[in-house]
Amino acid sequence: MISTARVPADKPVRIAFSLNDAPDDTPSEDAIPLVFPELEQQLQPLPPCHDSVESMQVFKQHCQIAEEYHEVKKEIALLEERKKELIAKLDQAEKEKLDAAQLVQEFEALTEENRTLKMAQSQCVEQLENLRIQYQKRQGSS
């Protein structure tokens, strides 16, 4: 089972083994990592049988796979972080789009209100002019 827990990208992987295919007569236990901290227990490399070339090769392969696994997990973590950044940018762009649409609607409403008010002002000016004319006619007839 693969864990979904994140491995820090800056966490070093320590792998120690001999690239010499000949088995040592006195292998050093310190040279073989017993634990890869980022791996689950069932994925940990088992210590090799030092008398078996095949066992050492399998162990080396397992260590290389563990290192590749660490690199893949690191890349996945970076990609997930990038995904979060892109989602945040997309959310921001959608919010700005909605804000722009709202501003367009508000502008259209204000433009219509302005047109209506100009028409009302024009009617008021016309009525005022008619009242002046009527007032002048009354003044002239009295």
Curated annotation (Swiss-Prot):
Coiled coil stretches, renumbered: none
Tissue expression: Ubiquitous.
Domain notes: Contains a C-terminal domain similar to that of the C-terminal section of MAP3K7.
Protein's recorded name: MAP3K7 C-terminal-like protein
Organism of origin: Mus musculus
Taxonomic lineage of the native organism: Eukaryota, Metazoa, Chordata, Craniata, Vertebrata
